[in-house]
Amino acid sequence: MEKVYIVKLDWSTEDGNDTELTVYGTYDKAYAKFKNLIADEMNPENSWVGNLEWKDGIPADDKIELDFLDHRNDTDETECYWLITDTWNFGTHTYISIENKEVL
């Protein structure tokens, strides 16, 4: 069976929301997109996340919750995710993930 790797960006703020799906034939390409999306979110011109203060890779604001899972090694095809939520406004979040799917 063949595999495909779906990179999902799901975001929501008070101003709007959207979901973007991108399908890749290799895990390496999907993982590169996953990391690029996270980097893009850290840019204040692109996302609410970019306006946050960070300390040691974690949001400094206690009302912001970050949960993530990265792949463990270069040969692992982990279904990674990066979820950041404003716990005082659950409508404000960014969720980025890689999903591995088998296709017939």
Each language-model region and where it sits:
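Short aromatic-glycine-(Arg/Gly/Cys) micro-motifs in beta-strand/loop hairpins
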Residues: 1-20
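N-terminal cationic leader/targeting segments used for protein routing and processing
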Residues: 4, 30, 101-102
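A short, charged, amphipathic alpha-helix used as a generic interaction element across diverse proteins
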Residues: 12, 25-45
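Residues in flexible loops and secondary-structure boundaries
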Residues: 15, 31-32, 92, 104
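Short beta-strand segments
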Residues: 19-22, 94
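Generic detection of short hydrophobic beta-strand segments and adjacent strand-loop junctions
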Residues: 22-25, 102-104
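Short, mixed-charge low-complexity intrinsically disordered segments
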Residues: 39-104
